[in-house]
A protein has these predicted regions:
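Canonical Rossmann dinucleotide-binding motif of NAD(H)/NADP(H)-dependent dehydrogenases/reductases
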Residues: 3-35
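The beta1-alpha1 cofactor-binding region of Rossmann-like NAD(H)/NADP(H)-dependent oxidoreductases
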Residues: 41-42, 62-73, 105, 218-219
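C-terminal substrate-recognition "lid" of short-chain dehydrogenase/reductases
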Residues: 120-123, 131, 213-242, 246-248
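Alpha-helical segment proximal to the catalytic Tyr-Lys
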Residues: 128, 172-176, 233
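Residue(s) in the substrate-gating loop at a strand-loop-helix junction
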Residues: 143
């Protein structure tokens, strides 16, 4: 059965590149009006323009989602474009690399701000808007590191574990009110976020995946669209991995 979102409006954060861009493009191709949100207006507008060029409907918004007022404005933009029926809290950053005992405090606050607080803000402002719109579905972008540890990334790992817990809690709260909420946990995906990795580092990452390669943004997007669709109507409060066997080791 083909997934369709005609008559639905989606808000996707971190949609200027990588996984978020793939999700925004796929949602638009499936008929949704997409509010493309990114830190940089230029990046968001570029994706919105691509959607328009392909015959879809999109609006571009920007700002730092670590600021609750920015997220509130992004939700308002969705409401101005037909409501809020689909929400993907995807924005994220990697942060500094350092062991917990040496981790910079400002780095901790920055990572928690974008990777955890922004997800809460998306739920805090998005859920009332979604209820007003008649219900819908939400996907929070976690990570494989929402279930395992990873040395020298304490803030990232802590945030992603918390996203999984927040997802399960909110899903319980709104399961009877027409809102489903799930989390997706990608492994290492071949996106611009890995552009600074040299060949040795990429090979080290690849070796951690039994599939023998990095993931593709389209593979994550395919799962996200399924979870947002009516085909996943009995799935809520779940954490779904896209990891090439990473956590099976």
């Amino acid at each position: 059965m083909e997934i369709q979102f005609h008559g639905k409006t989606a808000l996707v954060t971190g949609a200027g590149s990588g996984i978020g861009e793939a999700i925004a493009l796929d949602l638009a191709a499936a008929g949704a009006t997409v509010v493309v949100a990114d830190l940089k207006q230029e990046a968001a507008q570029k994706v919105a323009d691509r959607i328009a060029a392909q015959g879809g409907k999109a609006a571009a918004v920007s700002g730092n989602v670590a600021d609750p007022e920015v997220v509130k404005a992004q939700v308002a933009a969705a409401m101005a474009n037909g409501g809020l029926h689909l929400l993907v809290n995807n924005a994220g950053i990697g942060g500094p690399s350092a062991p917990t005992g040496d981790y910079p405090l400002d780095g901790w606050n920055q990572v928690i701000g974008v990777n955890l607080n922004a997800v809460f803000y998306g739920l805090r402002f998005g859920i009332p808007a979604m209820l007003q719109s008649g219900g819908g579905a939400i996907v929070n972008m976690a990570s494989i590191l929402g279930s395992v540890g990873f040395a020298n990334a304490p803030a990232y790992v802590a945030a992603k574990h918390a996203v999984v817990g927040l997802t399960k809690t909110a899903a319980q709260e709104y399961a009877t009110q027409g809102i489903r909420i799930n989390a997706v946990g990608p492994a290492f995906i071949d996106t611009p976020l890995l552009s600074d990795f040299d060949e040795a580092a990429r090979n080290w990452l690849i070796a951690k995946h039994p599939a023998g390669r990095l993931g593709r943004a389209a593979e994550v997007s395919a799962l996200v669209l399924f979870l947002l669709s009516g085909q996943a109507g009995f799935i809520t409060g779940s954490y779904h991995l896209v990891d090439g066997g990473y956590t099976a080791l």
